[in-house]
Curated annotation (Swiss-Prot):
UniProt keyword terms in alphabetical order: Cytoplasm, Nucleus, Ubl conjugation pathway
Species this chain originates from: Petunia hybrida
Entry keyword annotation includes Cytoplasm: yes
F-box domain ranges (all copies): 2-55
Name this protein carries in UniProt: F-box protein MAX2 homolog B
Length: 723
């Protein structure tokens, strides 16, 4: 008798409710798109469960507005083409015209459940009428604007927003060009909206001076229920109204529910590279005391994330940071700028930030007195760190950084080393060898040093067993942490300047001399997925592999930032920058090439100089060898004429990268240069974005005209894509 065949069961046989929950749990956009291609049933379920959507079409093509995403709660309208142009037509009257009203109505009808909205708001008309379409459901709004502010009275734009969206609890103005004077009046005029706010982001690089004491007092008084507050401040005591003791105490008193607090000086937000030779101390000290910091931290017991990034000395901050351990037990992320005395262990005792044993992320910048032993103290105390950033710390050497990496070998996966005099590319990579099989994200500076330089470094012997670094005497307390260095020799800590033979051969990856080898071998960065590089103008990328990054089998994304004044160079030393060397990374598909901080001559250069078009050719030469799918490119700029435009050589070289599917140019381009890009066979998405301050206002130039961009998009969408 023949056996009855067992029916083959597939995922599609699951009940629709269960299958719908499975698909709803998928968050990655590309994975959801692939899910929708399986069959019609999965397509319907994917569309009905998608909650996040970014629209990229042209606003004039309303017939293409998708109507199947009825469950969208997060809607991003900041990238609609043509980028940066008003979404709703501007009028002198208080009411939108018919076209604008139709656009707003269709968006609300298509996406009825929006609770979070991101919007490019170039004019007040858009701010007033579009968010108001979801007045009863909208909770979070992010406004984006890189163009100049409209000529209105202080606070008028935000007042229009608050009147139309009375239910919002979260407001993000971090990329919205406005004045600090706009915020306090709008909050005072709408006390109910201000009282409802729980998240407020004012970390805006466009503020020339940041918020001052009186403004901070008004904002925090109007918003007592804030749980997340990020703000650009003025800490420089040379300015009237600088942030000092009064403002900090007022903040902690008025907003005791804060779990996320970011206080950053406006000069930090510009992301300009510091001077590696700087000692880390400024002429002026910040005008708030350690006792004030202790009072503030004591009043914010719910803190989970703290950024205190100032540009003036905060001296002897160790005792205040020790308070964080007991007063802010939930603290997991900490960033400090210009704080001194954060880790100065004496007689084997940990102190300062090293006692914050619950930290998962730590970032430090311009700590003038931090040396290798202080860094090792941090590694001993903060043994759970998964992310570590260090910037502008002149006294740190490769030996201290390597010891820290060894101590945190089991947890550390994200590292940034920037602008440290003794940590160039090779020394940084050598220091990170203990975690090279675990690290996933990395930033280094492409300052090409050599191994021979390491051997001449002054230092001490950190002669303790790194295999026991997370245990030993330091783990004697019930929590598994301690306040001492444990197995480290006390004499070593008493004599911080003692010199003796280093404990491992710098030409080997083993630690053998003291019998405490940890077996770090090989040169493969097995899990590295993201790499960020800083490089000075005129320098070459070709030594990257020789520095220690020759084998990165899983590297998918790279960001290269080039900075400097090319007017100081007659020409580069080689014909090409070295992008072709990146072909050794087989999975590299996404690149950010940021030449936006290169300064040069956009037009005719003086005799003996190269204009920016030739520099663009230098940096893009060889890009055709890479199998990139997505590229973000920032052209170099001429600040004298506020021009950041794609040149003819750049357009010609970009068209040779035939694998590209997405190309975003953060600048302007002539229409006929853009037409070169149509020769890329699989290119699906191209956009010009002037997302820098100040964005050009002249919309009549061929680089900016909306009709020019629309003609290119029509030609792009008219092509047949092979897949």
């Amino acid at each position: 008798m023949a056996k009855t065949p067992i029916p083959f069961t597939t995922l599609n046989d699951l009940p629709d409710v269960i299958l719908s929950n499975i698909i709803a749990a998928v968050s990655d956009t590309r994975s959801r798109n692939a899910t929708a291609l399986v069959c019609h049933k999965w397509l319907v379920l994917e569309r009905s469960t998608r909650t996040s959507l970014t629209l990229r079409g042209n606003i004039r093509d309303l017939f293409m507005l998708p109507t199947c995403f009825r469950s969208i709660t997060y809607l991003d309208l900041s990238l609609i083409s043509p980028w940066g142009h008003p979404l709703l037509a501007s009028r002198a009257t208080d009411a939108p015209d018919n076209d604008s009203a139709l656009i707003a109505h269709l968006l609300r009808h298509t996406f009825p459940s929006v609770t979070s909205l991101t919007l490019y708001a170039r004019d007040p008309n858009t701010i007033q009428f579009l968010p108001a379409q979801w007045a009863h459901t909208l909770k979070h709004i992010k406004l984006v604007r890189w163009h100049q502010r409209a000529q209105l009275a202080s606070g008028d734009e935000l007042n229009l927003l608050f009147i139309g969206t009375p239910q919002i609890t979260s407001l993000d103005l971090s990329n919205f060009y406005c004045w600090t004077d706009d915020v306090p009046p709008a909050l005072q005029s709408n006390p109910n909206v201000a009282c409802n706010l729980t998240r407020f982001n004012l970390l805006n690089a466009s503020f020339p001076e940041g918020f001052k004491t009186d403004e901070i007092k008004v904002i925090t008084k109007c918003c007592p229920n804030l749980k997340e507050f990020k703000v650009a401040c003025m800490f420089d005591p040379r300015y009237i109204g600088f942030i000092g003791d009064e403002a900090l105490v007022c903040l902690a008193t008025n907003c005791p529910k804060l779990s996320v607090l970011h206080l950053a000086d406006t000069s930090v937000l510009s992301n300009c590279r510091g001077d590696p030779n700087d000692e880390g101390f400024t002429v002026e000290d910040a005008q708030f005391s350690v006792s004030t910091l202790i009072e503030v931290f004591s009043g914010l017991s719910l803190l989970e994330e703290l950024v205190f990034d100032v540009c003036n000395n905060v001296r002897d901050s160790g005792p205040a940071l020790e308070i964080l351990k007991t007063k802010c037990p939930k603290l997991r992320s900490l960033k400090l700028g210009q704080f001194h005395g954060i880790s100065m262990p004496i007689e084997s005792k940990l102190d300062g930030v090293a006692l914050c044993q619950g930290l998962l992320s730590l970032s430090i910048r311009s700590v003038g007195d931090l040396d290798d032993m202080g860094l090792i103290g941090i590694g001993r105390g903060c043994s759970r760190l998964t992310k570590f950033e260090i910037e502008c710390c002149k006294k740190i050497t490769m030996r201290g950084m390597r010891t820290l990496a060894s101590l945190l070998r089991k947890s550390l996966v994200d590292v940034t080393i920037s602008c440290c005099k003794n940590l160039g590319a090779s020394s940084s990579l050598k220091a990170l060898e203990p975690i090279q099989d675990r690290i996933q994200r990395l930033h280094i500076d492409c300052v090409w040093d050599t191994v021979e330089e390491f051997e001449n470094l002054d230092g001490v012997e950190y002669g303790f067993d790194l295999n026991e670094a997370s245990g030993g005497e330091a783990s004697s307390n019930p929590a598994g942490f301690g306040d001492t260095f444990g197995s480290m020799d006390d004499d070593l800590m008493n004599n911080r300047n003692k010199r003796c033979k280093y404990s491992y051969d710098l030409n080997s990856v083993y630690v053998e001399n003291n019998g405490h080898g940890n077996g770090f071998c090989g040169r493969t960065w097995d899990r590295l997925q993201y790499l960020s590089l800083w490089i000075g103008v005129g320098e070459l990328l070709t030594p990257l592999a020789a520095a220690g990054l020759q084998d990165c089998p899983k590297l998918e994304e790279i960001k290269i930032k080039v900075e400097g004044d090319c007017r100081l160079w007659s020409k580069p030393s080689e014909r090409a920058f070295g992008l072709s060397t990146l072909i050794q990374y087989p999975k590299l598909v996404k690149m950010h090439l940021d030449c936006g901080d290169i300064i040069g001559y956009a037009h005719t250069a003086p005799s003996g100089q190269m204009d920016l078009s030739l520099w663009e050719r230098f940096y893009l030469m060889g890009i055709r060898h890479l199998n990139l799918r997505e590229l973000d490119y920032w052209p170099p700029q001429d600040r004298d004429v506020n021009q950041r435009s794609l040149s003819l050589p750049a357009a010609g070289l970009l068209q040779e990268c035939v694998t590209l599917r997405k190309l975003f140019i953060h600048g302007t381009a002539h229409e006929h240069f853009m037409m070169f890009l149509l020769r890329i066979p699989n290119l699906r998405d191209v956009q010009l974005r002037e997302d820098y301050y100040p964005a050009p206002e002249n919309d009549m130039s061929t680089e900016m005209r909306a009709d020019s961009l629309s003609r290119f998009e029509v030609a792009l969408n008219r092509r047949q894509i092979c897949d």
